[in-house]
Amino acid sequence: SLKGDDIIKGLYDLWKITKPNTLLLSIGLIFSLIGTSFSLYIPLIIRNALNKSSLSTDKIVIIIICFGLTLIFSGVSTYILGYIGQKIIQNIRSVTWNKVIKLPYSFHLKNSASNLTSRLVNDTMNITRVFSVEFIFSYSITNIFIYN
């Protein structure tokens, strides 16, 4: 079983290998934070309106603007983080493929090309899923708890 230190070291090594664009990553995470903030502001406006038993035109406009801003910021964040995830996977495949090519001839005799290709594609797809789905989902959930 993996220990916490092993996981952190593995993620650090993966970070060094893949060299993600930190500027884009920062922008994506900031946009995610902003989108989450707007989405959490909407229920507060509605709650206040329900407590006062009236929903003015101004509040409706603010709610619509918040929905729009949530959509824009969350959409841009998802696009940027997805793009970064694909670049990370591309780098992982490149690094892995270059290592496979440099392995001795005896290794290639023991392992079929189709098996190596299948492993490379499937393993990087699993890493893609972690970065693109589970990381973004856990980050969004964390934002909700932080802002609540």
UniProtKB/Swiss-Prot annotation:
Q: Where is the ABC transmembrane type-1 domain?
A: 25-148
Q: Which GO terms describe its molecular function?
A: ABC-type oligopeptide transporter activity; ATP binding
Name the keywords, alphabetized: Cell membrane, Membrane, Plasmid, Transmembrane, Transmembrane helix
Membrane topology summary: Multi-pass membrane protein
Listed transmembrane segments: 26-46, 60-80, 127-147
SUPFAM superfamilies recorded for this chain?
Answer: ABC transporter transmembrane region
* GO CC annotations, alphabetized: plasma membrane
Q: Where in the cell is it found?
A: Cell membrane
Q: Which InterPro entries match?
A: ABC1_TM_dom, ABC1_TM_sf, Type_1_exporter
Signal peptide per UniProt: none
User: Taking the first listed entry, what is the main subcellular location of this protein, grouped into a coarse class?
Assistant: membrane
Give the protein's recorded name: Uncharacterized 16.7 kDa protein in epiA 5'region
Q: Which organism is it from?
A: Staphylococcus epidermidis
